[in-house]
Amino acid sequence: LKNLNVWGDGGIITTDSDEHAKRLKLIRNHGLIGRNECVEFAYNSRLDSVQAVVVKHMLGKIDNITKSRISNALYLDDKLNGISEIDIPKRNNDVKEVFHLYMFRANKRDELQQYLISKNIDAKVHYPIPMHLQEAAKKYGYTEGDFPVCEMAGKSVISFPVHEFVTKNDLDKIVDHVRSFYGE
């Protein structure tokens, strides 16, 4: 649901389990049964009325939003293909990707990001420190090298927006500057 933007935080959980549904309803509302009986400490995870109105409106646009994101991502796939210093993920025709972000692995990722930012391109690095190397995970005893693929991704993945407001001109600018950075 990251592609369905509301004006703040929101989310959705679906289940076909009555047991799970009952528990989820309980924990979304402070663990309250009725108004005055708290059977479990929990958070307020309900959408407020304004958020609910925004979500209801946006749900009617989700198909177009998704089509736009897919189109933008596949356009970048096509235009960036062949640049030797980047690795675009292989797409599986049996999987419908909706592209919250467009991501690929890049050699000299940090330098590329700084170059693109200097050209006013919204290039981001998400999750540069893998979860197993975060302070919160120290108690589990993981060390660098335990998850090499994850660590490599943390050091090389860069992302770009492909939301419905990105234009072909914006995408071409990304492509031109990535090619320019790598001298291709």
Protein language model features and the residues they cover:
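Active-site PLP attachment segment
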Residues: L1-R23
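PLP-dependent aminotransferase class I/II
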Residues: D16-E184
